[in-house]
Amino acid sequence: DNGGGFRGNHPLKSGKGSLYEGGIRMPTFVRGPGIKMGSYCKVPVVQWDFLQTFYDLAGGREPLPADLDGGGLRDVFEKGNKGRVKRNTKELIFHFPWHTGMAESVIRSGKYKLRKDLDSLEMELFDLSKDIGELTDLSGEMPELVRKLDRKRSAYLDSVNAETVTLTRRNYVELLKGGWIENGKNRLAKLKAELSADPDNKQKAFQVGVSQNHVDFQDRQIERSTRLIKMHEQRGTADK
């Protein structure tokens, strides 16, 4: 899927829903002709490499669109750590403008990884060759590299017209106000009426509690998203 849970993910930091290594680093297992049994490779690959890989292995001859993000993995399969993945961008970029959680964006270049919080705009720099747990932030020691990587990250996101977190939050708020909240409150009112008629019904009482929590959560999400949208507008900053 996309990373382990927040517990038991050592030595990786964080887990699902995060762009720290605990949320994006996953093992990949491959077997087939030309692949040495029991071999191990440290070359980073990503899911969007598989399209070109499968096309190549299936014998595709016609050129694929030039603007594809990924690259073929045949060279890595056959040569291991000596193999290379040819992509349009040398860096790996992960962009997660999450409307209900921690909005963040990451660029990895070689052994270095820059993570940017899209709300606070704070950035962290890690050397993954020495610090896979992302415990030591090097941004203060290497400010030029931070600026360089952030410019590359931003330029790439602009080139693919990536969504901003403000846009995803606006769409989310409109979706909630467009029917989700009303439907949730109507269901809650119906369940409360049924429980009032049968106050000893434990299952119905449980359903009321779950429904109430869901309605309260959506109300909090609208409040949070609206507040953060206003913050970005007042600050006049890009949020990608």
Describe every region a protein language model picked out.
Residues 28-37:
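The feature captures the short pre-catalytic strand/loop hairpin that immediately precedes
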Residues 50, 109, 120-122, 128-240:
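Long, internal low-complexity/basic segments
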Residues 3-8, 16-19, 36-37, 43, ...:
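C-terminal cap/loop subdomain of S1 sulfatases and analogous C-terminal strand-loop tails that border
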Residues 37-40, 135-137:
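A generic structural signal for short coil/turn motifs at secondary-structure boundaries
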Residues 31-32, 94-96, 221-224:
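Tryptophan-centered motif/residue detector
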Residues 12:
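Flexible nucleotide-interacting loop at or near the entrance of a catalytic core
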